[in-house]
Structures are given as structure tokens and as C-alpha cells.
A protein has these predicted regions:
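Selective transmembrane alpha-helices of multi-pass membrane proteins
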Residues: 66-96, 153, 160-161, 175-207
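Alpha-helical membrane-protein architecture signal
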Residues: 6, 10, 107-119
């Protein structure tokens, strides 16, 4: 049980460390308008992730362990995690450059920020694939435990994004993170590849 939690929670958090559209939207808004304005985006992103998590949980609970659909889900999750891990390993590194200029930049309200964050999360298909892959690791566990994992993931997304928004007000923090980003992406990629191998092994064992 502890091993499963560390594997799922670790993969989820490491994936958060690799910047995507949500990250840059939060950082730019925090730099231009402060972390309070950016917090609306953080809540919207968490809600969007929560929707994908709920769909992944509902889909998993509808599939019986050992069925052909269950095996297909495991293999699809394994292949996607392996692809994502390989992309991170071979990536030359994501460049973090945020323009701090405020000339002509509209000042979004908190509600507008929430809608922006929600749209950013929902329009990123990688979120749906990633959570479907993660929940394939939870196959066979009680539904109540799967739901707790979902609550945990939403909480971590919100907490991490709020931390990013608060830290983005300090350019030195952003620059320090950027210097270590390549190493973070490599560790994340290697971890996702190992998890993909584990999922594939489970799929073979269930044949």
C-alpha cells in the first residue's frame, strides 16, 4: 500500500515539476499582477484537473479487473507513460522566459483568472491521458481509496500552483528553478519510464 502511494504520488508530483501551459500562465500572471490575481488561475487549473481525475476514476470503476478492456487500459497507460518519460529524457530542456513588462497588459479579475485556468487545464489533452494512465496503476484497489487518491491529486495540484504563484513574485526563485529544470526533467522522465515498465509487468501477469 505504501509502495503504491509513493509510486503514484511521486509520479504525479514529478510531472507537476515539468512546466506546461498552466505553469507559464500562472507565472506570467503572478509577475504582472501579483500572486492573489494568479490564485484564481490556480483554482481553475485545479478544477480542470479534478474533472479529468473524476472521469478517470469513473472509467476505471466501470472496468472489471482481468477483462480485455482492463488489459487494454493497462497497456495504453504503460505506453503513454513510457512515451512521456522518453520525451522528457530526450528533451533539450524547457526554456523559462517570462516577460515582466506591464505595458498594455490587461489586469484580469479573480473570476476571469479562474476561467482562464479552467480552460487551460481542460484544453490540454495531455492531462486526460496522464490521469487515465495514473489511475491504471490503481486498478484493483477499493473505490474509496481511489477517490482518496483523486482528492490528494487535486489538493497537490492546487497547493503546488499556489506555491508557484507566490514564488513567481521573486525573480531569483524563477531563475534558480530554471537552472535546475533540465535535471528535474531527466529525473521525471526516468521515473515515468520505470513506472511504465511496472504497469506493463502487471498487464503481463494478468494474462
Amino acid at each position: 500500500m505504501i509502495e503504491q502511494f509513493l509510486m503514484v504520488a511521486g509520479a504525479h508530483f514529478l510531472a507537476l515539476l515539468s512546466p506546461g501551459p498552466d505553469f507559464f500562465l500562472i507565472v506570467r500572471t503572478a509577475l504582472l499582477h501579483g500572486w492573489r490575481r494568479a490564485s484564481g488561475i490556480c483554482v481553475g487549473v485545479a478544477l480542470g484537473n479534478g474533472l479529468f481525475i473524476g472521469l478517470a476514476w469513473a472509467g476505471l470503476s466501470a472496468i472489471q479487473p482481468g477483462s480485455p478492456a482492463f488489459t487494454i487500459l493497462q497497456w495504453a497507460g504503460s505506453l503513454y507513460l513510457a512515451w512521456l518519460g522518453w520525451q522528457l529524457l530526450r528533451s533539450p530542456g524547457t526554456s523559462i522566459t517570462v516577460d515582466g513588462s506591464t505595458h498594455g497588459a490587461p489586469r484580469p479579475g479573480w473570476g476571469q483568472g479562474l476561467r482562464m485556468g479552467l480552460a487551460s487545464a481542460l484544453l490540454n489533452p495531455k492531462n486526460a491521458l496522464f490521469y487515465a494512465s495514473l489511475f491504471s496503476l490503481l486498478a484493483g484497489t477499493p473505490r474509496s481509496l481511489q477517490a482518496l487518491y483523486g482528492v490528494w491529486m487535486v489538493s497537490v495540484v492546487l497547493g503546488w500552483d499556489l506555491l508557484v504563484a507566490a514564488a513567481a513574485g521573486h525573480r531569483a526563485v524563477v531563475e534558480r528553478f530554471a537552472r535546475h529544470l533540465r535535471s528535474i526533467e531527466r529525473v521525471t522522465g526516468a521515473t515515468l519510464l520505470l513506472i511504465a515498465v511496472g504497469v506493463a509487468t502487471q498487464a503481463l501477469a494478468n494474462r
